[in-house]
Amino acid sequence: MRWQLCRAVLFLLVKKGALMNFAKRAEETESAIIKDRHFLHEHAELSFEEKETTAYLVSELEKMGIPVQTFPDYTGCIATIKGKKGDGPTILRRADIDALPIMEESGVDFASRTPGGMHACGHDCHASILL
């Protein structure tokens, strides 16, 4: 089922000539996504402790001129991006940002600096891609 949906989306992209635009945009943003992912991976924080993660995300969003809402008693943030056509349907995109209570032993250059915490779950990737 998932593969059929992917093929259908790919067909629509090719049919509308958007595949090249998608590939070009992916290439343009690759280094930024990797930079963000490495930072988030190195600074893994457990659930409800993601203060540095939230600060990083807020900073990056604000650099892009995106309004961000934060909450004094909670981690995470809400970024609101308005479309060019004005009011219309609303799309919600979200990413988890918490790490798991696991000691990283990967040996990669960007390994977690947090004792007993690492992104073995992919949340660092999800948040980076969403940025």
Label the model's feature ranges.
Residues 20-119:
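Acidic/His- and Gly-rich active-site-bordering loop/insert found
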Residues 113-131:
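Alpha-helical metal-binding/catalytic segments enriched in His/Glu/Asp
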Residues 3-19:
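Short, Lys/Arg-enriched N-terminal segments with co-localized hydrophobic residues
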Residues 11-14, 44, 101, 130:
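Enrichment for repetitive, rod-forming helical segments
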